[in-house]
């Protein structure tokens, strides 16, 4: 064998040795990563068990609690609660929508069931009625039930233990989603709803004051939550921008989608355009999502798709062309 061949063989052996060392290192690295992941999982389980031992609480078996909240009133929060709950039920998910606004009951009006209210949320909490007596089956969509708020009871009647009891019963009844229509701001009902949230939909208008108040809500989301007490992942917050008017954004009379996202720094769930159809639907007791011809109804349907993890293009964020603009090729 020539010296040249010998050198080649030596180089080949060295290369194979280096490859083996690298492969061994990669295997060791993968095992370390796997062990770290297992340790992390074990720590989470231990943390949950410790939390359960300390608080006497445990996670719900099935339900996901979605709280629709806002920093101020008049942003379309109850309209959004009704639309999102209806949309989830339309997708085949057993859904309950709960009105946490004790003393200012409105959800039943938008859902069109105000004349069918016999018992309410507080009646159930105070053992004056059973949950299945108070739940109202929606007349539009299967799989959807409404639990109205009380118009007459003291807001302090909404207790943590009472809400826990109701949610636990809904969990036992195989509900998948519970949508909570929270009062605006940080009063008792709002804080109670936020405490039980798995996800929070922060509803805001594209106005500075509305966005500022929403920022306060985001700030308190994880300050005291059931999830943190149970050692679970933090509450997920998503942005729902309502009453959006692209022409006003263009004139700098309104914040743009990007402006609001920059200020609140939470993922965007949807943009709902300003529409007279919303008021018409609410007055008729029909959630706007049922109006499949309206832009607002379509936008809420898109938001529900995103809530379920589906990718949907963002619509209704640019100004629509008028007839003459289209004819003349303007308004691009």
What are these language model-derived features?
Residues 2-18, 23-35, 40, 44-57, ...:
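C-terminal lobe/tail of nucleotide-utilizing enzymes
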Residues 172-173, 183-267:
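Conserved catalytic-core segment of NTP-binding enzymes
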Residues 63-67, 176-179:
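Residue-level preference for the first positions of well-ordered beta-strands
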Residues 57-63:
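Phosphate-binding P-loop
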Residues 65-128:
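Walker A/P-loop NTP-binding active-site region of P-loop NTPases
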Residues 100-172, 282-283:
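P-loop/Walker-type NTP enzyme "switch/lid" segment
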Residues 96, 145, 179, 238-240:
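A structural signal for isolated positions on well-ordered beta-strands in alpha/beta enzyme cores
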Residues 118, 132, 160, 164, ...:
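Amphipathic alpha-helical transducer elements in NTP-driven molecular machines
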């Amino acid at each position: 064998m020539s010296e040249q061949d010998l050198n080649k063989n030596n180089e080949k052996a060295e290369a194979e040795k280096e490859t083996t060392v690298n492969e061994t290192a990669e295997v060791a690295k993968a095992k370390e990563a796997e062990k770290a992941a297992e340790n992390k999982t074990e720590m989470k389980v231990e943390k949950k068990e410790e939390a359960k031992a300390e608080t006497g609480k445990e996670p719900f078996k099935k339900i996901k609690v979605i709280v629709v909240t806002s920093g101020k009133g008049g942003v379309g929060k109850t309209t959004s609660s009704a639309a999102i709950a209806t949309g989830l039920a339309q997708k085949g998910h057993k859904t309950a929508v709960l009105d946490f606004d004790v003393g200012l009951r409105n959800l039943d009006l938008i859902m069109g069931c105000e004349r069918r209210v016999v018992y309410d949320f507080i009646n159930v909490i105070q053992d004056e009625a059973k949950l299945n007596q108070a739940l109202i089956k929606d007349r539009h969509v299967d799989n959807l039930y409404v639990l109205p708020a009380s118009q007459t009871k003291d807001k302090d009647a909404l207790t943590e233990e009472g809400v826990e009891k109701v949610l636990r019963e809904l969990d036992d009844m195989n509900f998948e989603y519970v949508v909570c229509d929270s009062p605006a701001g940080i009063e008792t009902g709002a804080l109670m709803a936020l405490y039980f949230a798995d996800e929070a939909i922060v509803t805001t208008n594209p106005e500075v004051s509305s966005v500022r108040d929403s920022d306060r809500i985001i700030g308190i989301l994880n300050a005291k939550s059931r999830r943190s007490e149970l050692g679970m992942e933090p509450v997920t917050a998503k942005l729902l921008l309502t009453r959006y008017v692209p022409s006003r954004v263009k004139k700098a009379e309104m914040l743009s989608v990007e402006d609001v996202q920059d200020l609140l720094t939470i993922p965007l769930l949807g943009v709902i355009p300003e529409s007279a159809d919303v008021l018409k639907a609410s007055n008729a007791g029909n959630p706007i999502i049922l109006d499949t011809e309206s832009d607002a109804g379509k936008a809420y349907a898109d938001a529900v798709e995103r809530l379920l993890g589906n990718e949907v293009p963002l619509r209704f964020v640019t100004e629509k062309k008028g007839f003459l603009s289209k004819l003349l090729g303007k308004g691009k």
